[in-house]
Amino acid sequence: MNKKSVGQPPEGLHETKSLASALPEKNAEQRPKYVQIVALPSEIKSRELPIAPDNVVYFNGPTHYLSALYPCTVVVDGNEYNSVEHYYQACKLYVLTGEQSAAQLKASETPIEVKKATKNILKEAKIPAKKISAWKDKDSIAVLKHVIYHKFNQNDELKVKLLDTGDKILIQTYIGDTYFAAGANAKYTSTWVDRHVNQSLKYPENVVVDNVQYLPLVANGKNVLGWILMQVRDELRMRSSA
């Protein structure tokens, strides 16, 4: 069965005009207008998943078990965290502002609170946006893969739910993020899926900082969190069948 791969247009910066022009001006300004797309080299081991409405799982927000904001106890290196987001933000602060700042997050009970607290701490410490962005580019993927694996490996109910998604494409539908999410809401992303039925998404099997540039465009974003979840799913499946 031949399927045309999408999400790998000619290399370069690609403008997400179609969505931005349909949004209120305030929302359109909340995310980048361009997403970097680089063709996937043939020497990088890859996988391909068919695009179809029944082969996609959309997720967003603290009520969805796939979200980093979902309240869930995770133990990493002997330390307990209330969610993936708690660990992610703690790692960010540890590197950028030090151990004491990271420890302050223990007072933040919910993932939303921990995001706000981190933002305030970084602002008070006068950490420039460029430095925060550099941490994200260098460390965020490894941090997320590590904690997300622990999240599902330690919680049997969540692990079963993740494995039950089979080989479906997991897409974070958040309009304000074209890196970790699709840069679009569920309605728009669903329309994008409908337009690309009988095509496929080809992506690097191992999602690491060196090949994130090769991830295909999903709606208007890179959907990095979705691809990380799919890799964790593959790893858990392999361990379960071993």
Curated annotation (Swiss-Prot):
<protein>
    <recommendedName>
        <fullName>Uncharacterized protein F44E2.8</fullName>
    </recommendedName>
</protein>
<dbReference type="InterPro" id="IPR037238">
    <property type="entry name" value="YbiA-like_sf"/>
</dbReference>
<feature type="region of interest" description="Disordered">
    <location>
        <begin position="1"/>
        <end position="27"/>
    </location>
</feature>
<dbReference type="InterPro" id="IPR012816">
    <property type="entry name" value="NADAR"/>
</dbReference>
<dbReference type="Pfam" id="PF08719">
    <property type="entry name" value="NADAR"/>
</dbReference>
